[in-house]
């Protein structure tokens, strides 16, 4: 009889653990959106491009940028989502951002853009 009572308690405890695990929401997937903020002409045929990114869920994150999407990150980890890079004018580029949260979640995004025409220099 005592063995049967222990079996009931173990069964009830197991059921409670399973239900609490099912009720705990999973962490929200990390997403990132990369975009061009602005382009400013420099010295004739070059453009300073400001890139940035937003993440969901919002909160502290670390960012790395690959300015030409060639597989090599050009920046160190930074808490700032915004960077600037100089590109030749009138060319198409794809930049890639990698975002990492403190909990280890990682997300990537790319932004493709054509740099503005800057003949003769100035804004």
What are the residue ranges of the model-derived segments?
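Extracellular/lumenal mature domains of secreted and surface-exposed proteins
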Residues: 3, 15, 20, 24-123
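Bacterial Sec-dependent N-terminal signal peptides
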Residues: 2-9
């Amino acid at each position: 009889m005592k063995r049967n009572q222990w079996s009931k308690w173990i069964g009830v405890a197991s059921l409670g653990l399973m239900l609490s695990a099912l009720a705990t929401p999973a962490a929200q997937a990390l997403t990132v959106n990369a975009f061009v903020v602005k382009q400013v002409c420099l010295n004739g045929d070059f453009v300073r491009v400001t890139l940035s990114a937003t993440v969901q869920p919002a909160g502290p994150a670390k960012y790395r940028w690959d300015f030409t999407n060639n597989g090599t990150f050009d920046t160190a980890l930074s808490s700032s989502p915004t960077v600037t890079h100089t590109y030749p004018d009138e060319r198409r580029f794809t930049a890639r951002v990698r975002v990492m949260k403190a909990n280890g979640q990682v997300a990537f995004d790319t932004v493709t853009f054509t740099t503005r025409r800057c003949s003769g220099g100035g804004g």
